[in-house]
UniProtKB/Swiss-Prot annotation:
Belongs to the UPF0182 family. It is found in: Cell membrane. It comes from the Bacteria. Residues 898-948 are annotated as: Disordered. It comes from Mycobacterium bovis (strain ATCC BAA-935 / AF2122/97). GO terms for cellular component: extracellular region; plasma membrane. This is UPF0182 protein Mb0065. It is a multi-pass membrane protein. Residues 902-912 have a biased composition (Low complexity). The chain crosses the membrane at residues 19-41, 63-85, 114-136, 174-196, 208-230, 261-280, 285-307. Residues 913-946 have a biased composition (Pro residues).
């Protein structure tokens, strides 16, 4: 066998070389072409939105990581290969029948450089590409600062654990990978070239092979010693005691922590024993040291903590874990901002002591009670305000508030977006889908506390023109008319949640000056986009790039695309924010608002950490279902701040990031990493700030934690006796928890309307009400949490019990049977409202939807009844149930005649007006009169009109209305043929 000279190598013909070269070029193009196209498109898109610096910073960071890791891994592996190759035996017996690696050895000897460099570079590049995903850790390490808070065990600033430690661990992991790969490369190379030979009954190892393998093995063990040292700090995020609490417990501090130090010492001794193999031929010392390390890891690192936990800690857990539970409580409250000045606790009896009309706060609260449910009314909005088949609203509408004529009112709001999935027939042609149908039209709102008329006749509810929202529409048709309740100067919507559902998601807009418009605007007009958004495809190179990206040749050949054309991509507001700020976690629910005459999407964004010492882990995102159907828990965090409010302009797609938490050290770190990307809080316009809502995702995390972390005493925390639970949703059969709800309630100090996100809480493994949590959204008190704590022995019913009490009421049960003959019933939000100076009022709208008799007919929900319930002013825990077509009448039933009418006069009259007569469904109202959305003025309450007189007058008026209803029914019956 020839080992030194490769001999004469065969030469390929010129044509064959050309074919091989062309084939390799095509393969490279197929492998890397799409990625290069994506990189160029990202370059263009980030430049369009003004965040190219973010793209460049992330790219350079990842390239630097690739280069660093690739150099380290490739260098160490190449050095190992080179040493093993140069120290190979000079003579290796060439016996293929006894040496199975002889053919491979011959092949390697022909191209030793390709063998060495090829393996080293390949491993280095692969490791570098994988390591590049750790760019976040690198940026946090480089730009991280301090928190000003030290951990209670080591006395280090929290910044060390969240900014530095993850980086150190990442570096250590890649050094591990490099050294292990070098060890394996050395082992295989020595085996290939005869430095290591395995024969029957024994093996042979040359001195060079022994030294090299011992050095790399010692390096691995030495790195393991460093890992044990870092493990000490990571104990502060230990999950041993979960779900009771997160963080180091008694066993971690008194067994695991000393064990790590012992293992550090043993690992160092073991590494030294491996290094002695450089001078000693006997490998038994390193072998015994390795066995000692493994045995110590099992006994000291595993068995000792296990025995301590089982026989010392668990029998006395309430006492021995007390200081560590206290650490967990303090850290969790700080990490999630559920302690200190951010949370106000108040004792609350749960039983009303006054009439609502005697409490100014209650007058405001009941007047603003929300009857429209954004989860139910999307189809109603779509059917009545759709205008065209290709327009639609989001599956779940949103809730916001607007001050109209000086009065604050909450609205159900939605954007009339283009729905790509609703295009049919020729509308799905490429030109129509991407060039003609490009945008939505208008902002639609409806006062949340009223409908157009009360639905009184249970037998003919579906045929009545009642129970529908009173729409305030701001669209193209109403533009410039002066009749818009919420003025919008640019109602066209090119960016939104629904429009982004196109597959693929892009629209081609723009045209040369003076060219004929092509985009559908209204039935009588077309439009040409003039916004700043979009990537230019006016040159042939960009057109070719996008034709490649979307695999669509029409980018190249369509005459509809000209020199001024642009392509709009990434049209989902949430996606746009995620792309320009990949270091933020976005809320699942962007919502539209009107600011300065423009429709913009507000996206709540969070800074998060997952290594905050002692802080409880929680899931900021809901369960995620994989394509294979496996349900996994969402992103786990141990620190969260709603530090950024982002906006996306619905017309031109402009993304703006605003700082919203000056005290967040994580946001300050990211602002140093990406300077100029986040505007300071001082630059937030007041009109925009007035529409900020407390985000639902954050509130859901906080309420689930407050269920436990309202407890101050560690022993009581351990017993769980004082814990609360998030109630199950009584209107959902899927065993889901009750979602929080936005409400406009009276402020305790001023009695003025205050916009809040709220939730009821029940006892642990009980259904009785235990607490009521609300988060302020008003600018002056934004982020403050108010917790009303009920007595532990309360008999005030929780949401599930109240739901059962209401639907089992004889009036409800009997009429429900009647309604279900021709309707489907939908129960809306079950709202819990503090009222009557200590009581809790439950309000639940009941919607009916006519059962469709044919596949082509469309049906949609309408408000038909309002259920209310309040606890009896006694200690037994009984409840009163109100059930009527209007909130006012339902309140009369539980508080006495006239009470509901007086208390809800600002918002109740419009909802309780008698129906104007039988008729079909309410026709779409493109531009309603501006006054229809205003709450009617409250009745005068001067000294010359006693409350009793007002109540009597209203009761008499209600009787007259009932007589009129009976008279109308009699007239209708007389006019019906055969009647």
């Amino acid at each position: 066998m020839e080992t030194g000279s490769p001999g004469k190598r065969p030469v390929l013909p010129k044509r064959a070389r050309l074919l091989v070269t062309a084939g390799m070029g095509m393969l490279a193009l197929l492998l890397f072409g799409p990625r290069l196209v994506d990189i160029y498109v990202d370059w263009l898109w980030f430049g369009e939105v003004g965040f190219r610096s973010v793209w460049i910073t992330v790219l350079l960071t990842r390239l630097a990581i690739v280069a660093a890791v690739a150099l380290v891994v490739a260098g160490i592996v190449l050095a190992a290969l080179l040493l093993a190759y140069r120290s190979r035996p000079f003579f290796v017996p060439d016996e293929p029948q006894r040496d199975p690696v002889a053919p491979l050895r011959s092949a390697v000897m022909r191209r030793p450089r390709l063998f060495g460099w090829g393996i080293a570079v390949t491993l280095g590049v692969v490791c570098g590409l994988i390591a590049s995903f750790d760019w976040v850790k690198v940026q946090l390490f480089v730009h991280g600062g301090t928190f000003g808070i030290v951990d209670p065990e080591f006395g280090y600033d929290i910044g060390f654990f969240v900014f530095d430690l993850p980086f150190y661990r990442s570096v250590l992991n890649w050094l591990f990978v490099a050294v292990v790969l070098a060890f394996l490369a050395s082992l295989l190379t020595h085996y290939l070239f005869g430095g290591l030979r395995l024969t029957t009954g024994r093996g042979m190892l040359t001195q060079a092979a022994r030294v090299q393998l011992a050095v790399f093995a010692g390096a691995v063990v030495l790195l393991k010693a460093v890992a044990y040292w870092l493990d000490r700090y990571e104990l502060l995020s230990s999950g041993r005691k979960e779900p009771t609490f997160t963080g180091a417990g008694y066993t971690d501090i008194h067994a695991e922590l000393p064990a790590k130090l012992v293992l550090v010492a043993i690992a160092v001794l073991c590494a030294v024993s491996f290094f002695t193999a450089i001078f000693l031929r006997d490998l038994r010392i390193p072998a015994m040291a390795a066995a000692l390390l493994v045995l110590s890891a099992i006994l000291v690192g595993g068995l000792w903590p296990l025995l301590m936990e089982q026989f010392s800690v668990r029998p006395n857990a309430a006492d021995v874990e007390r200081p560590y539970i206290q650490r967990n409580i303090e850290a969790t409250r700080e990490a999630y901002r559920i302690g200190g000045d951010w949370v106000q606790y108040r004792s609350y009896p749960g039983i009303g002591t006054k009439q609502p009309r005697d409490v100014p706060v209650d007058v405001t609260t009941i007047a603003k009670v929300r009857l429209l449910d954004p989860h139910i009314l999307s189809r109603t909005f779509t059917q009545q305000q759709q205008l065209k088949n290709f327009f639609s609203f989001a599956e779940i509408l949103d809730i916001d508030r607007y001050r109209i004529d000086g009065e604050l009112q909450d609205y159900i709001v939605g954007v009339r977006e283009l729905s790509p999935k609703s295009l049919t027939g020729n509308q799905t042609d490429w030109i129509n889908k991407h060039i003609v149908y490009t945008h939505g039209n208008g902002f639609v709102a409806a006062p949340a506390n009223r409908v157009n008329a009360a639905a009184r006749d249970a037998e003919n509810i579906s045929d009545s023109n009642s129970g529908y929202p009173i729409y305030a529409v701001s669209d193209i048709a109403s533009l410039g008319s002066g009749r818009q309740v919420i003025p919008v100067e640019q109602p066209r919507v090119y960016y939104g949640e629904v429009i982004a559902q196109a597959d693929p998601d892009y629209a081609i807009v723009g045209g040369a000056p003076g060219s004929a418009p092509r985009e559908y605007d209204t039935d009588t007009s077309k439009y040409t986009y003039t916004g700043a958004g979009g990537v230019s495809i006016g040159n042939w190179f960009n057109r070719t790039v996008f034709a490649t990206k979307f695999a669509q040749h029409k980018f190249l050949f369509s005459r509809e695309i000209g020199s001024e054309s642009k392509v709009l991509i990434h049209r989902d507001p949430k996606e746009r924010v995620q792309r320009v700020a990949p270091w933020l976690t976005t809320d699942d629910n962007p919502y539209p608002v009107v600011v300065n005459g423009r429709i913009v999407w507000i996206v709540d964004a969070y800074t998060t950490l997952d290594t905050y010492p002692y802080a409880q882990r929680s899931s900021l995102e809901g369960p995620v279902t994989s394509p294979t159907g496996i349900v996994r828990q969402g992103k786990q965090v141990s620190y969260v701040r709603n530090s950024v409010k982002a906006t996306v302009d619905a017309y031109d797609g402009t993304v703006t990031l605003f700082q919203f938490d000056r005290d967040d050290p994580v946001l300050r770190t990211w602002m140093r990493a990406f300077p100029g990307t986040v505007k300071s809080e001082d630059q937030i316009p007041d009109e925009l700030r007035a529409h900020f809502r407390y985000p639902e995702d954050l509130f859901e995390v906080q309420r689930s934690l407050l269920a436990k972390y309202h407890v101050d005493e560690p022993r009581e925390f351990f017993t769980t006796n004082a814990f609360w639970s998030v109630p199950s949703d009584p209107t959902n059969d899927a065993n889901a928890t009750q979602p929080p709800f936005y409400v406009l309630v009276g402020d305790q100090q001023s009695a003025q309307p205050s916009f809040r996100l709220a939730s009821a809480m029940v006892g642990y493994n009980r259904e009785f009400l235990s607490a009521y949590i609300s988060a302020h959204s008003d600018p002056a008190n934004y982020g403050k949490l108010t917790v009303l704590e009920l007595p532990t022995d309360t008999l005030t019913q929780g949401p599930q019990q109240i739901q059962n009490s209401m639907i089992s009421d004889t009036r409800v049960a009997s009429e429900r049977t009647l309604l279900e003959r021709s309707n489907r019933i939908h129960y809306g939000n079950l709202l819990s409202l503090p009222i009557a100076d200590g009581g809790v009022l439950y309000v639940e709208p009941l919607y009916t939807e006519r059962i469709s008799t044919s596949p082509s007919s469309s049906t949609f929900p309408q408000l038909s009844r309002v259920l209310v319930s309040v606890r009896e002013p006694r200690t037994e825990g009984g409840v009163r149930v109100g059930y009527a077509p209007t909130l006012a009448e339902s309140l009369d039933q539980v508080f006495g005649p006239g009470t509901g009418r007086v208390a809800t006069a600002p918002g109740g009259d419009a909802a309780s007006a008698p129906p104007p007569g039988a008729g079909g469904p309410a026709p779409p109202q493109a531009v309603p009169p501006p006054r229809t959305t205003q709450p009617p003025a409250a009745p005068p309450r001067g000294p010359d009109v006693p409350p009793a007189t007002v109540a009597e007058l209203r009761e008499t008026l209600a009787d007259l209305r009932a007589v009129l209803d009976r008279l109308e029914k009699a007239i209708d019956a007389a006019e019906t043929p055969g009647g």
